[in-house]
């Protein structure tokens, strides 16, 4: 069973401790140690005890203020072994006996303790287990205020480094799949607090686990935030991971349980690799069918649905031990411009924003989201500040990423968010076209951002931020506030340098067991099956294989995935790869068919116009056969706008193999469709083709 409450076992927790970096032994390491504390005594740490085990961790706090995880040369002891025992690794086992015990740790010179009270109630049923409640009694005192002590001991350069998260996607023109000496030097020179990984960097499970461990080994005083965009659906980075259906597919299921399971499974895979921060989920409300960048990355057009499923996904992700990031605040759903390519605008007033765009983010904040990513989008009704673009000297509105009114006044003060604010990538044209690299970074920090993601020119930006502090453009208090939030997140998620290196082979073995596991594949298949939405069916589905003697499958380059699924039912199906009107030979196959399955794939508005080559092909097929034509909207459910007269239409919301298989299983009646449209499908005459919530079944 995929259950968080059954995952708190000694084996899993022991492996979890392996995913953080280690400090190289040094002759004066002992001399710098000022204290030894139990991690769970730190006020910012939420201790969850489920089942009968808990893994305690010990930290050495150094005279300079930074802290490292103590893993060797320490001894654990329980004062009452009838109540609980503790092993050499700090794993506490509770025996279901009423009473109290102190768990003590010592390194021979320093020690700390934490108390547990156990109260057991009789089983409610004859064959059920007794109910055990464990209460944690933390030690208190200034010794546990390690975050502020750490900040006090950092230089300005070190503080700024914590606020930078560059990518090392490529180096000297080649994808970075192994740690390079030059990258290690940059991490240490600029005291980096984190990095972001891309698909080029995470090729295999073994390679990824080793690269992440090497990144962490290169870190200085604190562990790195290792982030990635593993949303599921069309935005996935892990090449060896489970490609979960995306948010709109989950929106079609209407299932909070599935959203949690998908979030948890994604988190398990990331955690197994040592990746501790996921830049997901997307909480944008996709109420604009012309949106070229969000689309199926959103749970749908209804803010309550987005909030409900988004919070479930967040809880699953964070229950796995991985930090979640809601994006793109205050909302990128109602735009028709891709901020990677231009500067979009959301023109709505505060009342509308409060009810729609901001609603899912507010619910995520109330649920304890770790971080929020900003949008490179202008909101003139929130901030009407004009700045001069470096691109052409014209006046433009200030993007949310650089807006004090959006990040501080709205997000911090009005909505009450005190977690980490991270910018979207600063190399996107919505920012880089209009602002210089240093100007953009300084404006983002002044606005309230804690982490500058993918700064353009690491050295230039690091030095520029330092100068801005020195000349009074950014206050020391502003920097300290960001560093406090970043270190709080790291402490909360248990991201520390370890004093001794873990067993790399053990990390790899665990990652191989988790990443792409059969358990996760089953969740992927379940989510895909429940997402398939039968939008139209003129009494042609389900198809019966006994009556389909000549099936033709048509589609673009993704037709191979569709073909693979179809051949599980009709091994001799004819396949045509095309995304434009067919030639005579291809048309002849269509004319001879007794059924045609067409997969259409569109990225944007132009792709689904009836005049586009792909849609002309679909119309051509209609004109050349009397056989039923079944269409699948592979990505966007809006494709049917271009061919409303099709006999049957299914929406699958993504191009994962599991989604193709689920769609084909539905066509042949093996999967009963239960998906409901998470968006409204308009018609080209200004009306509505299919309402939000529409969905047929058998």
Positions of predicted regions on the chain:
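Preference for extracellular/luminal or secreted protein segments
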Residues: 89, 119-188, 434-698
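Short glycine-enriched loops at secondary-structure junctions
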Residues: 169-172, 227-236, 276-286, 326-332, ...
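Catalytic domains of carbohydrate-active enzymes, especially glycoside hydrolases
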Residues: 182-198, 265, 269-277
């Amino acid at each position: 069973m995929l259950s968080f409450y059954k995952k708190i076992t000694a084996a899993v927790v022991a492996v979890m401790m392996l995913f953080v970096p280690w400090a190289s032994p040094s002759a004066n390491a002992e001399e710098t140690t000022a204290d030894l504390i139990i991690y769970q005594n730190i006020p910012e740490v939420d201790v969850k005890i489920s089942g009968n085990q808990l893994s305690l961790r010990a930290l050495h706090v150094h005279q300079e203020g930074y802290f490292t995880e103590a893993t060797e040369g320490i001894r654990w002891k329980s004062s009452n072994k009838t109540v609980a025992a503790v092993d050499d690794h700090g794993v506490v086992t509770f025996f279901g006996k009423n009473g109290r015990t102190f768990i003590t740790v010592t390194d021979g010179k320093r020690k700390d303790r934490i108390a547990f009270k156990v109260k057991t109630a009789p089983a409610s049923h004859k064959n059920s287990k007794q109910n055990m409640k464990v209460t944690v009694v933390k030690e208190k005192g200034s010794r546990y205020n390690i975050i502020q002590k750490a900040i006090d001991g950092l230089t300005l350069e070190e503080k700024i480094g914590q606020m930078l998260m560059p990518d090392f996607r490529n180096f000297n023109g080649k994808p970075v799949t192994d740690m390079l000496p030059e990258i290690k030097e940059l991490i240490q020179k600029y005291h980096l607090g984190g990095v972001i990984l891309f698909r080029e960097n995470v090729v295999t499970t073994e390679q990824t686990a080793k690269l992440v461990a090497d990144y962490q080994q290169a870190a200085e005083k604190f562990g790195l935030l290792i982030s990635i965009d593993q949303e599921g659906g069309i935005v996935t980075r892990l090449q060896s991971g489970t490609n979960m259906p995306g948010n709109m597919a989950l929106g079609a299921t209407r299932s909070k349980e599935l959203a949690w399971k998908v979030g948890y499974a994604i988190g398990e895979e990331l955690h197994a690799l040592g990746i501790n921060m996921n830049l997901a989920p997307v909480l944008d409300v996709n109420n604009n069918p012309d949106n070229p960048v969000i689309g199926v990355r959103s749970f749908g057009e209804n803010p309550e649905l987005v909030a409900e499923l988004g919070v479930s996904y967040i809880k699953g992700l964070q229950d796995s031990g991985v930090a979640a990031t809601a994006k793109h605040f205050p909302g990128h759903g109602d735009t028709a411009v891709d901020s990677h390519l231009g500067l979009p605008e959301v023109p709505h007033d505060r009342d509308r924003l409060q009810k729609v765009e901001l609603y899912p983010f507010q619910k995520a904040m109330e649920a304890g989201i770790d971080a929020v990513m900003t949008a490179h989008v202008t909101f003139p009704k929130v901030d009407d500040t004009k700045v001069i673009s470096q691109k052409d000297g014209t006046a433009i509105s200030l993007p949310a990423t650089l807006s004090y009114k959006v990040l501080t006044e709205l997000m911090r003060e009005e909505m009450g968010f005190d977690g980490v604010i991270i910018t979207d990538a600063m190399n996107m044209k919505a920012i880089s076209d209009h602002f210089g690299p240093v100007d953009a970074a300084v404006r983002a920090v002044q606005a309230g951002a804690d982490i500058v993601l993918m700064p353009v020119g690491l050295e230039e930006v690091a030095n520029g931020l330092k100068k801005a502090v020195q000349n009074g453009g950014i206050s020391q208090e502003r920097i300290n506030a960001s560093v406090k939030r970043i270190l709080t997140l790291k402490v909360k998620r248990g991201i520390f340098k370890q004093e001794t290196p873990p067993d790399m082979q053990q990390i790899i073995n665990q990652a191989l067991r988790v990443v792409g596991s059969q358990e996760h594949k089953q969740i992927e298949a379940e989510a895909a099956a429940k997402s398939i939405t039968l939008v139209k069916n003129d009494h042609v589905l389900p198809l019966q294989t006994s009556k389909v003697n000549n099936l033709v499958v048509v589609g673009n380059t993704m037709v191979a995935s569709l073909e693979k699924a179809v051949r599980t039912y009709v091994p001799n199906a004819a396949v045509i790869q095309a995304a434009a009107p067919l030639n005579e030979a291809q048309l002849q196959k269509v004319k001879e068919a007794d059924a045609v399955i067409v997969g259409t794939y569109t990225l944007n508005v132009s792709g689904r116009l009836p005049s586009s080559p792909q849609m002309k092909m679909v119309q051509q097929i209609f004109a050349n056969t009397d056989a039923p034509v079944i269409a699948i909207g592979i990505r966007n459910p809006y494709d049917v706008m271009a061919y409303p007269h099709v006999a049957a239409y299914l929406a699958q919301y993504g191009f994962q193999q599991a989604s193709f298989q689920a769609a084909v299983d539905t066509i042949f009646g093996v999967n009963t469709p239960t998906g409901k449209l998470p968006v409204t499908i308009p018609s080209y005459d200004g009306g509505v083709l299919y309402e939000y919530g529409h969905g047929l079944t058998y």
